[in-house]
């Protein structure tokens, strides 16, 4: 067993662990930061993210809006200083519905999100003196409005989003939203953290020593040895392994994992244009299986999830640059 010392041990080298190490070492000058993970950085769940962001949160209070406004400020600063290495865009989130009741709820939620600090709600009904609508660019984030545009005027809706279902009655385009390359962001922060002295150990945290109710050391098992790191601070950024790490401290954490399904499909018909924003369908729906497909799906172990009513909130965005024709489709079905 080899012995080392550090100011802090961070357990988990996903985006949360890397950003923690980056903040401590790069922004706050902390030295002797250890980042431990049995897998290479950004390879468990962080590289499988939607990679999207939004400040549009209609409750239950203003906590998420304040958190995300600050987070987006930080992202913009990093994009500026790195020449947008992680390709952050400001295409926005477009919430859509064919339900008039849901359309009214979207307006009420928009008023609420605006009151929490997400920016003004601009309502487009086609009346004289109404607000102007500024389409979002496909790249970049500078010079874009915040808040949201609620489009109820049919002609503007069809002109701006001709690819949406003809049944669509309302569109809420939240503006301080978009996506970026999470992998590139993680690698950028990791490079800067390492340059500031952060040590990455590819190993599993196997034991956490406490003295007087305080962390005193951490044992990390690598392929070749066990490393004991004397450190008074231990940060858990273990993602889906959170309960396992908690058990090392004798703590049963009341958390669960939620299965988010991400499907990549080739849009060979070009249904969704490559400059489209992040699209969310707010209504429940059924998938239009043929009789043959329905019979096949019914034989799958969880086939009933796909044959019944799909929950609201299924969303999609384009994936890849250049000549890519792929879409990402994301939905949440069950807890595991």
What are these regions (language model features)?
Residues 1-5:
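A short, basic/flexible loop-to-alpha-helix module at the beginning of a structural domain
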Residues 22-26, 38, 49-55, 83-92, ...:
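Active-site substrate-recognition segment that forms the wall
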Residues 165, 172-233:
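Helical element adjacent to the flavin cofactor pocket in flavoenzyme catalytic cores
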Residues 45-47:
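Conserved catalytic-core motifs of eukaryotic protein kinase domains, centered on the activation segment
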Residues 16, 41, 241:
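Conserved Rossmann-like nucleotide-cofactor binding loop
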Residues 6-34:
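N-terminal Rossmann-like FAD-binding beta1-loop-alpha1 element of flavoenzymes
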Residues 51-155, 311-314:
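Dinucleotide-binding Rossmann-like beta1-alpha1 core, especially the glycine-rich loop
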């Amino acid at each position: 067993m080899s012995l080392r010392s550090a100011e802090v041990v961070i357990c988990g080298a996903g985006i949360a662990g890397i950003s923690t190490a980056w903040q401590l070492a790069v922004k706050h000058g902390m030295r002797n930061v250890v980042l431990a993970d049995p897998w290479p950085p950004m390879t468990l769940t962080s590289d499988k993210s939607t990679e999207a962001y939004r400040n549009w949160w209609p409750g239950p209070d203003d906590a998420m809006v304040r958190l995300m406004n600050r987070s987006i400020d930080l992202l913009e600063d990093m994009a500026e200083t790195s020449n947008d290495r992680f390709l952050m865009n400001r295409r926005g989130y477009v919430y859509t519905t064919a339900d008039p009741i849901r359309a009214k709820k979207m307006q009420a939620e928009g008023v609420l999100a605006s009151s929490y600090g997400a920016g003004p709600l601009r309502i487009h009904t086609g009346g004289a003196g109404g607000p102007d609508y500024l389409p979002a660019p496909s790249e970049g984030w500078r010079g874009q409005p915040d808040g949201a545009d609620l489009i109820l005027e049919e002609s503007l809706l069809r002109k701006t989003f001709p690819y949406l279902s003809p049944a669509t009655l309302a569109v809420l385009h939240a503006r301080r939203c978009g996506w970026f390359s999470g992998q590139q962001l993680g690698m950028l922060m990791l490079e800067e953290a390492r340059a500031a002295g952060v040590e990455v150990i590819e190993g599993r945290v196997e034991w956490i020593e406490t003295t007087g109710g305080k962390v005193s050391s951490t044992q990390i098992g690598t392929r070749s040895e066990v490393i004991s790191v004397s450190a008074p601070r231990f940060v858990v950024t273990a993602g889906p392994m959170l309960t396992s790490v908690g058990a090392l401290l004798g703590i049963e954490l009341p958390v669960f994992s939620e299965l988010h399904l991400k499907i990549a499909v080739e849009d060979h018909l070009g249904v969704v244009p490559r400059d489209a924003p992040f699209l969310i369908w707010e209504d429940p729906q059924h998938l239009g299986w043929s009789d043959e497909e329905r019979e096949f799906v019914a034989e799958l172990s969880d086939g009933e999830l796909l044959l019944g009513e799909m929950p609201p909130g299924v969303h999609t965005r384009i994936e890849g640059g250049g000549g890519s024709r792929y879409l990402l489709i994301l939905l949440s079905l069950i807890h595991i």
